[in-house]
UniProtKB/Swiss-Prot annotation:
This is Putative pterin-4-alpha-carbinolamine dehydratase. One of its GO terms (biological process) is tetrahydrobiopterin biosynthetic process. Gene3D superfamilies: Transcriptional coactivator/pterin dehydratase. It comes from the Bacteria. It comes from Xanthomonas campestris pv. campestris (strain ATCC 33913 / DSM 3586 / NCPPB 528 / LMG 568 / P 25).
């Protein structure tokens, strides 16, 4: 699906059941497309920490990220701190990672790279 367009331009699709859980080969293809993100929890999730100058910028990023989550109907786990946000994606309905996690990771990284919160 997302091989033809960049991940940040793709949109999430409903995914339920283990048929949509990504295997090691597909994870190895997708992970390089989201620089800065790391596999976590034995390949069951991806995480990235985003750092900011202050709490205002941190929360501005969280609010912008919330819009992405709402629009894609795919919601991360967040750890919000004064100067950083830890973002974790996993698809509970498939029991691990799905393409939706990588689509949203790319969109969130693009948001950060564009400096929306500066």
């Amino acid at each position: 699906m997302t091989d033809l367009i960049p991940l940040e331009q793709a949109h999430c699709l409903p995914r339920k059941g283990s048929d949509h859980k990504l295997g090691e080969a597909r994870l190895a293809e997708l992970l390089p497309q989201v620089p800065g993100w790391e596999l976590a929890e034995a390949g069951m999730a991806i995480t990235r920490t985003f750092r900011f100058a202050d709490y205002y910028r941190t929360l501005a990023f969280v609010n912008a990220l919330a819009w992405i989550a709402h629009r894609e109907d795919h919601h991360p786990d967040l750890g919000v701190h004064y100067d950083r946000v830890v973002v974790r994606y996993s698809t509970h309905d498939v029991g691990g990672l799905s393409e939706n996690d990588f689509i949203c990771a790319a969109k969130v990284a693009q948001l950060f790279d564009q400096g929306i919160t500066a």
